[in-house]
Amino acid sequence: MGSLKEIDTRIKSTKKMKQITKAMNMVSSSKLRRAESNAKQFRPYMEKMQDAITAVAGSDKNSRHPMLQQREVKKSAYLVITSDKGLAGAYNANVLKHLIKDIEEKHASKDDYSIVVLGQTGVDFLKNKGYDIHDSLIDVPDQPSFKEVQAIAKKAIGLYSEGEVDEVKIYFSHFVSVLENTPSTKTVLPLSPEDSSLGHGQMSSYEFEPDKEAILSVILPQYVESLIYGTILDAKASEHATRMTAMKNASDNASEIIDDLSIQYNRARQAAITQQITEIVGGSVALE
């Protein structure tokens, strides 16, 4: 058991830390609500895009657009979504662990894949592990706009369009609920047959000019960019939820430590008082 001064110092420092983690919990809670709202508001746009894809591509099974063509996978591109900041529990670790596991199982050479990273944490981790990073985007806002992440989405799509890779996959943490987030993988290129038939068919009676292939060349890249953006919004909600939970757990642990230290402090104080009384009584007896 430490001295009264040492225990008191630890109590004060732990209380300060609790104030910080509690404040961070409240901030993350606010950011989570906004992130959930952003993802919800983006869904109608995606549904309309899917309607357009269904109308144009769903009725034309002979489309030769590269984004709809399945080809032999010789090289893959992995878009990895992580956070720029820490204190987010296992949010980054789970996604990066999932990525590395797949790379080790599927690829014998670094020439077989390219990695594009969102978030400083992912950049630092992969560089320290010796992985080459083709491109990256850091300092991503907590509530990113489409324009702020469009450039990195275009680069990932460009790798596929230019024939440098044969598929593009996203590794991210999927937001299920405040208490549940799942490391997930999504293939965004090539688009599967299901992707061209997800709409509600509300545009099937339209005529398209100049022709469907020309329209597909415009809307398919926009659609894939939207898929990537929607996934980033999902991952951001997961990040805020994980950080909120981590800060709550840290605050709860700080409370337990403060309680334990308070008990130690009271015991030490009681022992000191008892010792003083004993010395006084002993001194009185000696004077008699």
From Swiss-Prot:
Subcellular location: Cell membrane
Signal peptide boundaries: none
GO cellular component, one term: proton-transporting ATP synthase complex
Lipid bilayer topology: Peripheral membrane protein
BP term (GO), one: proton motive force-driven plasma membrane ATP synthesis
UniProt cross-references to Gene3D superfamilies, sorted A to Z: 3.40.1380.10, ATP synthase, gamma subunit, helix hairpin domain
Record-annotated disulphide pairs: none
Disulfide bond among keywords: no
Molecular function GO labels: ATP binding; proton-transporting ATP synthase activity, rotational mechanism
Cross-referenced SUPFAM superfamilies: ATP synthase (F1-ATPase), gamma subunit (SSF52943)
Residues that span the membrane, as ranges: none
InterPro entries for the chain: ATP_synth_F1_ATPase_gsu (IPR035968), ATP_synth_F1_gsu (IPR000131)
Keyword Disulfide bond: no
Alphabetic keyword roster: ATP synthesis, Cell membrane, CF(1), Hydrogen ion transport, Ion transport, Membrane, Transport
Biological function: Produces ATP from ADP in the presence of a proton gradient across the membrane. The gamma chain is believed to be important in regulating ATPase activity and the flow of protons through the CF(0) complex.
Oligomer and partners: F-type ATPases have 2 components, CF(1) - the catalytic core - and CF(0) - the membrane proton channel. CF(1) has five subunits: alpha(3), beta(3), gamma(1), delta(1), epsilon(1). CF(0) has three main subunits: a, b and c.
PANTHER family according to UniProt: ATP SYNTHASE GAMMA CHAIN, ATP SYNTHASE SUBUNIT GAMMA, MITOCHONDRIAL
Family to which this protein belongs: Belongs to the ATPase gamma chain family.
Name of this chain's protein: ATP synthase gamma chain
